[in-house]
């Protein structure tokens, strides 16, 4: 039907959609002053609410990162940056900061939902958080973590879960934990056209079988087992793989043997890229909280947030806030009419 529309009409309609129509309401009837102007199609528009999820777009919009982009970066030796996100704001800032991959990791079970470990989170919760992050992410490649219990039973179960992540979670790829035993499952998913990020070394969903959060590959045989896992996952079609809590030298040697990128977390500087949990590295929790050895804190969001909220509390208590500049005006005439109406009622 749209193909029958005259091109001139379509062009006119496009121009009309960008025209800002001035309000016909008298100034005295305006309920509030503009919070900020929006520029749409060159015309300034007025806003009376701050409840918009997006701020101004970046001055220079990045190209969308794809699997092809990541392969090209790997060939050039350009380190791949990966950051977790669990909601719209964390996805938004990670994307604006230029992350190549944003991972909606099941670590959100602990850092966003207050659960004891990653095994508690369920599929529907992960899908909800994936959708939130996906709405904020315009350039980075997004990956969703398949939660425990949604892919281990059979390759068919795993594929069904992966499809839901793409269709309902709106991410571009999925991540799952496990070594060579998961190769048939990964093959099933990648054959269906869904990119898979593998995860070897320390696999947190299996911490009970591993004896807790312990460094893996500290013996020759243990390191060889991880290499075998890596080669099997590569053969199954993974576009990259996370290598967690493995000695730096072991991770570097494994990286050299592979033709796909490795993303290290607690695996030294010889991998193809790095990933950190966002709330850990920006300092989202109070001092004294346990952090793994490999985490470097780049900020103090907890401290800044605490100072801001305490300042707000103090200003509300002292009636310093809201100040006149934070309130909306009413004309003297209308205020007089309203005051009279209140007295007469």
Question: Where are the regions that the model predicts?
Answer:
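Alpha/beta enzyme core
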Residues: 40-44, 48-296, 303-345
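N-terminal mitochondrial targeting presequence
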Residues: 1-63
């Amino acid at each position: 039907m749209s193909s029958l529309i005259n091109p001139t009409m379509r062009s006119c309609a496009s121009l009309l959609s960008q025209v800002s129509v001035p309000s016909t309401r008298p100034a005295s009837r305006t309920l509030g002053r503009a919070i900020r102007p929006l520029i749409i199609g060159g015309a300034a528009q007025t806003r009376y609410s701050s409840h918009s999820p997006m701020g101004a777009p970046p001055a220079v919009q990045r190209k969308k990162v794809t699997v092809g982009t990541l392969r090209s970066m790997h060939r050039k030796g350009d380190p791949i940056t990966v950051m977790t996100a669990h909601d719209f704001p964390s996805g938004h800032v990670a994307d604006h900061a230029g992350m190549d991959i944003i991972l909606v990791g099941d670590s959100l079970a602990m850092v966003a939902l207050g659960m004891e470990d990653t095994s508690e989170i369920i599929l529907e919760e992960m899908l909800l958080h994936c959708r939130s992050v996906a709405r904020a992410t315009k350039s980075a490649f997004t990956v969703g973590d398949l939660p425990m219990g949604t892919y281990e039973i059979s390759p068919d179960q795993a594929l069904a879960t992966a499809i839901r992540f793409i269709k309902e979670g709106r991410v571009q790829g999925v991540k799952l934990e496990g070594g060579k035993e998961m190769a048939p499952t990964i093959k099933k998913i990648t054959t269906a056209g869904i990119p898979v990020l593998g995860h070897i070394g320390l696999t947190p969903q299996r911490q009970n079988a591993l004896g807790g959060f312990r460094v893996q590959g500290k013996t020759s045989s243990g390191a060889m087992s991880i290499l075998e896992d890596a080669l099997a996952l590569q053969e199954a079609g993974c576009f990259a793989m996370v290598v967690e809590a493995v000695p730096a030298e072991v991770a570097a040697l494994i990286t050299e043997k592979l033709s796909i990128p490795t993303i290290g977390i607690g695996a030294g500087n010889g991998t193809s890229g790095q990933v950190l949990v966002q709330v850990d590295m920006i300092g989202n929790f109070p001092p004294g909280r346990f952090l793994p050895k490999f985490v470097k804190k780049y900020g103090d969001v907890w401290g800044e947030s605490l100072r801001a909220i305490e300042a707000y509390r103090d200003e509300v208590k002292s009636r310093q806030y809201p100040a006149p500049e934070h309130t909306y005006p009413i004309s003297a005439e209308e205020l007089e009419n309203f005051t009279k109406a209140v007295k007469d009622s």
